[in-house]
Amino acid sequence: MFTIVKRRELNPTVTELCIHAPLIAKKAKAGQFIIVRAKEDSERIPLTIAGFDREAGTVSIIFQVVGAGTMQLNSLKEGEAVHDFVGPLGKATEIEGLKNVCVVGGGVGCAIALPIAQALHEQGTKVTGIVGFRNKDLVILEDEFRACCDEFIIMTDDGSYGEKGVVTAPLEKKIVEGANFDEVITIGPLIMMKFVVKTTKPHNVKTVVSMTPILVDGTGMCGGCRLTVGGQTKFACVDGPDFDGFEVDFDEAMHRGTMYKPFEAHAREAECNLLKQEVQ
């Protein structure tokens, strides 16, 4: 039984679930992911581990409600259990030996960036955090980031909180001013990561991107998560999810990411209709 021991709404569309999964908590590392299934007939959802407590035996996941699967997951309450919770999967983010790192997160991708920033902080690395959101209402995990970052910058598209603009603006400024980052680690929408790489590459600042494309089985068998990295086919679930940002074909990844949008919309509509029937 993978029981939900705590539930927290981070903003109107983003939820955090803390789930009792002692075996996963024992092995989990920052950057790895799990595959969760809310109910027996639910779709398999890959979610990067947002936190873990080895002593309590719990693992935290953070997700945005966007489709039928996440709607079903979001319907579960404290004390209820998810049907499947498999992991940890993928390779952990490599942070050993890093002295000065900039972690750049966007939207719900900040949930993935946070445990990496925390792990860096715990090993004594200087951490600069830059996160971006569309507006103030969508800001998440601010206190947690401030606790583990030596410097922390919030950007919003409309300027309703923090500084107005996109994450690449302060990143470019820091690099030009001589921040001397050993590495930039970025997690968020594909378009954001693409432009982070466009910002860092001219300065030859190593940039690691966390790729979470279509994932089904999580073991490399289905091939749904394939990416082109350095001209070669890679599988995010077993070769990643972290890759050298300079080598990733973002245009291909973005095209593949839109392939199932009509099916997702249909599934979401069907789930909404079922929920309406239950209410009636």
Model segments located where?
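Short, surface-exposed secondary-structure boundary micro-motifs
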Residues: K39, G87-P88, G230
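Ferredoxin-reductase
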Residues: M1-E80
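FNR/FR-type flavoprotein reductase catalytic core
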Residues: A68-V216
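Short, Lys/Arg- and Gly-enriched loop/turn segments at beta-strand edges
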Residues: S42-G51, L89-K99, C237
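Short Fe-S-cluster ligation motifs
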Residues: F235-D239, F243-Q280
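Local cysteine-cluster metal-coordination motifs and their immediate loop/turn environment
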Residues: I112, L190-I191, T212-D242, A270-K276
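A generic structural signal for residues embedded in beta-strands
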Residues: V36, D84-F85, L227
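Structural signal for conserved beta-strand scaffold positions within catalytic alpha/beta enzyme cores
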Residues: K6, G51, I154-T156, V209, ...
